[in-house]
Amino acid sequence: MRLSNKESKMLADKTVILGVTGSIAAYKAADVASKLTQAGARVEVVMTESATRFITPLTLSSITGRPVVSSMWELTSEFNIEHVALAEAADVVAITPATANIMAHLVTGIADDMLTCTVLATKAPIVLAPAMDENMFKNPVTQENLAKLKARGFVIVGPSYGRLASGKMGQGRLAEASQILDTIKQVLGRSGDLAGRLVVVTAGGTREPIDPVRYIGNRSSGKMGYALASAARDRGAEVKLITAVTSVTLLEPSGVGIIRVETALQMKKAVAKVVKGADALIMAAAVADYQPQSASKVKIKKESPRLTIELARTPDVLAEVKGNFVKVGFAAESEDIMANAQKKLKEKRLDLIVANDITDKNSSF
C-alpha cells in the first residue's frame, strides 16, 4: 500500500478566507496561500492596511488567482457589501499571522477594517495563527485575550519556539504552513461522516531494551499510522494516536490526542486503556515480536567475542485486545504476502487487514 503526496481532497472547492495582518511574518502567508490553492481551495485574501507594508496584495493575488481585499471602500462588480459577501461564502477563516493587536480587536468586537468586519459577520469557524515577540505573547493581556478567544470557539495554532524578528530565541514564531494547513483541514472535517466516532490508531516501531544503551527495534517510519490518524480526523472522528518510535521526524496531526510509548508492553497497556468506547482500532504500529528475557540494568561490556541474548515473546497486542469495535491489522511481509496476511486475518479475528510488501522501495512501512 502506497502513500500519496497529494493533499486531502477535502479542501477542494472550499472557500478559505485568509486574513493577513501587519507582522514581519506576513510574508509567510504566501506559502499558506500557495498550499491551500494547490489543494483545490478557493482562497480569498483579506489584508489589513499594515499587512500591505510587509507583503504586497499583488503577490498574494498572483498566487491565489483571486483579487485581494484590503480596503473597506473597494467596490466589487457584484455591488455586494464586501465583508458580508465574503463572510457568507466562507467555509473557514484563517488569520495568519495573527498579531496581538488583531486578537485584542476580536476580543472587544472592534470592527474598523475589512478583516475584523468579515470575522464579525461570518458564522464559519476561525483559525488564528499568532506571531509576535515572546514578551508580547506572554504578556498577561495577550494570554487573557487568547483564553477568551479559545472559549468562544476560535482554534489557535502555535506559536512555536524559534528565532524571532528580534534575533532572539523564544516562543512567538508563526507555526509552519503545513501545520496551519493541517489545522484548517481538522476544522473543516468536524462535520464529516465519522463525526461522533472514536478511532484509535497506533504507529511507529517499538523498542525492547537490552541494556540502558542498546535495544531491539525496527525501521518503521510511522508514516502510515500518522496518515491514517490525520485521515480519520479529517472525516470528523475523535482520534487517539498511540505512537512508538518513528524512524523519521513527523508532524503531529493537529487535533489528535497523542500518547507516546516505547515498548510492546507499554503499547499493550495504552491500547487497552484508550480503546474503551472506541469504534475502531487501526493497528499500524510495528510491534516487536520478541524482547530480551531479562534486560541488563547496566551497560553490557564487550569483554567477550560473542554475546548471547535469550529472547522471549512479547504480548500480542492486537490478538489480546478486547472490545466490540472494528479491528484493522497490518501484515508487513517480504514473501508469500497474501497468504501470510490472510492467515493473520483469520488467526487474530480481524475485520480488515492491510498487506504491506516491505521489499517494495515505495513501501509505506
Short names for language-model regions:
Residues 2-128, 133-365:
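A cross-family phosphate/adenosyl-ligand binding-site feature
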